[in-house]
Every structure is written in C-alpha cells, then in structure tokens.
Regions:
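N-terminal catalytic cores of NTP/NDP-binding nucleotidyl/phosphoryl-transfer enzymes
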Residues: 1-59
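Phosphate/ribose-recognition catalytic cores of enzymes acting on nucleotide-derived substrates
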Residues: 183-296
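N-terminal Rossmann-like or analogous alpha/beta NTP/dinucleotide-binding catalytic cores
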Residues: 47-132
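Residue-level signal for inorganic ion chemistry
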Residues: 15, 67, 106, 166, ...
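Glycine-rich, Lys/Arg-enriched anion-binding loops that position phosphate/diphosphate groups
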Residues: 129-231
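A structural preference for short, hydrophobic beta-strand core positions in alpha/beta folds
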Residues: 38, 78, 138-139
Length: 296
C-alpha cells in the first residue's frame, strides 16, 4: 500500500486557511516520500445530521480541482457520509484512515472535529498519533484584515456578489466548472452568443447580476468573458438560475465540453429590459467594461 500524508477537513471553498493546511500536507509528503492526499466527504455532514440542505461554495468537482491545481494534492478521497461513517467512533475513524489509505501523517486545522458526535478533536488526534507512531501537524487559523478566514464568511461574500473580496479571502478567484449545455440560443439572435452552464444542486449561486469573468477552455486557452447569473427576466418567466457567458474574441462550438468560469468583478445587478435591443446595447457596454478590466 502506498504511503499517504492526509489532510483532514471538508475544504469548502479551498480558502487561504485550507491552503495553509494543504501546503503543509504537500511539504510533509515530500519529506516522507508519500502521496499528498485529502480525505473529505461527498456531502456536508451537517446536511445528513439535520436533514436540511447546506449550500456550498464549490461543487465536489471544483473542490478537487482547486486542491490539485493550487496545492499539489495528488489524491482527493470523497468518502460517502452515510450512517456507518456518522456513527464511527473517533478512534476507529483514525484507524480506518491508517489501515485503508496508508496514512503515515495527518494534517488538520486547529478546530477539526471527527468521529461519532464530533467526539474527536485535535488534542485526541495528537494523542492517538503519538501512541501509534504517526506524525501530526495542527494548523492555526489564518486571518485577513483581522477576520478569521472561514467558509462561512466567504459564503456571505459570494452571495453578495463581492468577488474581489471573496478572492482575497479565498486566495484565488471564485470559480464554477461545469459542462456546457444547450440553451435557448437567444444570444445568437442579437449577435451575442453565450455558453450556458447550470449551477449544481446545493451549490451557492453568486448574487444575480453581470460579472467580468475569465473562462478556461478544455484545450488550455483562456478567454475574457461577460457572465450573467440569474433568471434572465427579459427573455424568460422561469425562476431557474442559469449562468450564461459571452466569450470575447471566441468563435466555435463548446457544447458538451467542460469549462471553468472564474469570477473577477460584479458589474451590475440583473435587470429586466423592455426590448431585446435594449438588452443588446447594455451587454455591449458590459463587454467594453470587461475589455477595460483586462487591459488595466
């Protein structure tokens, strides 16, 4: 069995606090000749325990992508948070990680809890690791502007559409990776074709409105974008939230391909226009704003 150094946590947003933990994981893995790994769950434990939906900053796809791309984590383990996992005693939980995944070292945040009824804490983690000859690092909280970096705080920024402040606390831009879907092609009728993405279930949609974005294509290219998040009130009566992006200077068909949209700045709230021509003029103005953003 290959040796692993395992980062413990849920990692929603993969923010600066998580980054400190994941960097230490990669560092320890290099020292020990092990694989840097992260152990997390396929859904929030709170959602299972309370039965209430929990809205996350990122999909599992984006959580994994951020950990791999930014911090060099080579193995992300999404364990099902089921009844067996929920009722597993904390000691059995650690023994499972060692026996099943070859853990030789753990890295956890200062407030990490684990095991049945969250009975395990970092003091018990240190104690158990010492007994078993396993290494352990506990990472202190990271602060920004006197505020502790947390997923909870960053969710409020994303919901408010404050993408620049969110990026400061995340350590990277907020992103959405999804497969391009067929839309109604209304953008084409006004000379502004868009690619359409869906917001995954139980993932936060940013505040409705228009954003400057940068879009990463499957072939490695990147394009400036103008992205509308919302219900498209000018052309639709549906309350379904969609993410539609116009790619500046791009021509081609991206249906069925996966894109990553990174949110840079919110330009305005979502508006209802009386005519498609008025909508077209406003989008053209937003395109000019996006061009100016990337030229600055």
């Amino acid at each position: 069995m290959e040796k692993t150094v395992i980062a413990l946590g849920f990692f929603d947003g993969v923010h600066r606090g998580h980054g400190a933990l994941l960097r230490k994981t990669a560092e320890r893995a290099r020292e020990l000749g092990a694989v840097p790994a992260a152990f997390t769950f396929d859904r929030p434990p709170k959602e299972v325990v309370t039965g209430q939906p929990v809205y996350l900053i990122n999909s599992n796809r984006d959580r994994q992508g951020l950990m791999e791309r930014l911090y060099g984590i080579e193995r992300v383990i999404f364990a099902p948070f089921d009844r067996e996992m929920m009722t597993m005693p904390w000691e059995a939980y650690l023994e499972m990680l060692i026996g099943t995944y070859g853990a030789v070292h753990f890295v956890a945040g200062h407030d990490h809890r684990f095991g049945h009824k969250n009975a395990g804490n970092v003091q018990l983690l240190r104690q158990k690791c010492a007994e078993m000859g396993i290494g352990c690092d506990i990472i202190p909280p990271v602060q920004r502007e006197g505020i502790t970096v947390s997923s909870t705080y960053i969710r409020t920024l994303v919901e408010a559409g404050d993408m620049e402040r969110a990026a400061d606390f995340l350590g990277h831009r907020h992103c959405l990776s999804q497969t391009v879907q067929h839309g109604q092609r209304i953008g084409r009728t006004i000379g502004i074709p868009t690619v359409n993405l869906a917001v995954p279930e139980h993932v936060l949609a940013p505040a409705h409105g228009v954003y400057v974005t940068e879009v990463f294509l499957p072939d490695g290219r990147r394009c400036a974008g103008v992205t509308n998040v919302g219900t498209r009130p000018t052309v639709s009566d549906s309350d379904r939230v969609s993410v539609e992006t116009y790619l500046l200077g791009f021509e081609g068909d991206l249906y069925g391909q996966e894109l990553r949209v990174e949110f840079c700045r919110r330009l305005r709230g979502e508006q209802r226009f009386d005519t498609l021509e008025a909508l077209r003029r406003e989008i053209q103005r937003n395109i000019q704003q996006a061009e100016a953003y990337f030229e600055a």
